[in-house]
């Protein structure tokens, strides 16, 4: 069954490719308060807790680890569904001018924009 699925031409290696990942856990991640404030403003996520900062630091270490992977001989994929023909449709507007109707669906708006609560801070009632 698996062999039948993999019989199409593919750029994905059929066997695991060994890769050496650098150990980034020994590199201390230092984030200054200005960077934290900027990230909070851009992401709408409160980073005041130690758990949030630890998650941010581990995410940075993971990104640093995968950024150093050698991809010299890896062909790029255009889609993960490379064995299927993707059907595209013409981009034609069939309905429009419904801004007011859509804005009425939101709990809060400001001018013609939706107002969303920060990611981990409850919206005040």
Curated annotation (Swiss-Prot):
GO terms for cellular component: glutamyl-tRNA(Gln) amidotransferase complex; mitochondrion. The keyword Mitochondrion applies. GO terms for molecular function: ATP binding; glutaminyl-tRNA synthase (glutamine-hydrolyzing) activity. It catalyses: L-glutamyl-tRNA(Gln) + L-glutamine + ATP + H2O = L-glutaminyl-tRNA(Gln) + L-glutamate + ADP + phosphate + H(+). It holds the Pfam family GatC. GO terms for biological process: glutaminyl-tRNAGln biosynthesis via transamidation; mitochondrial translation; regulation of translational fidelity. Keywords: ATP-binding, Ligase, Mitochondrion, Nucleotide-binding, Protein biosynthesis. It is an enzyme of class 6 (ligase). It comes from the Eukaryota. The keyword Nucleotidyltransferase does not apply. It is found in: Mitochondrion. Its main location: mitochondrion. HAMAP family: GatC. Subunit of the heterotrimeric GatCAB amidotransferase (AdT) complex, composed of A, B and C subunits. Belongs to the GatC family. Allows the formation of correctly charged Gln-tRNA(Gln) through the transamidation of misacylated Glu-tRNA(Gln) in the mitochondria. The reaction takes place in the presence of glutamine and ATP through an activated gamma-phospho-Glu-tRNA(Gln). This protein may be expected to contain an N-terminal transit peptide but none has been predicted. This is Glutamyl-tRNA(Gln) amidotransferase subunit C, mitochondrial. It comes from Drosophila mojavensis (Fruit fly).
């Amino acid at each position: 069954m698996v062999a039948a699925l993999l019989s199409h031409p593919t750029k994905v290696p059929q066997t695991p490719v060994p890769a050496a990942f650098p150990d980034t856990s020994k590199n201390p991640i230092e984030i200054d308060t200005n960077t934290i404030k900027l990230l909070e403003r851009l992401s709408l996520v409160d980073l005041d807790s130690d758990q949030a900062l630890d998650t941010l630091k581990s995410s940075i270490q993971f990104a640093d680890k995968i950024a150093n992977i050698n991809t010299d001989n890896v062909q790029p994929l255009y889609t993960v569904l490379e064995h299927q023909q993707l059907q595209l449709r013409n981009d034609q507007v069939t309905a429009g001018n419904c801004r007011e109707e859509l804005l009425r669906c939101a709990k809060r708006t400001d001018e013609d924009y939706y107002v969303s609560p920060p990611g981990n801070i409850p919206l005040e009632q």
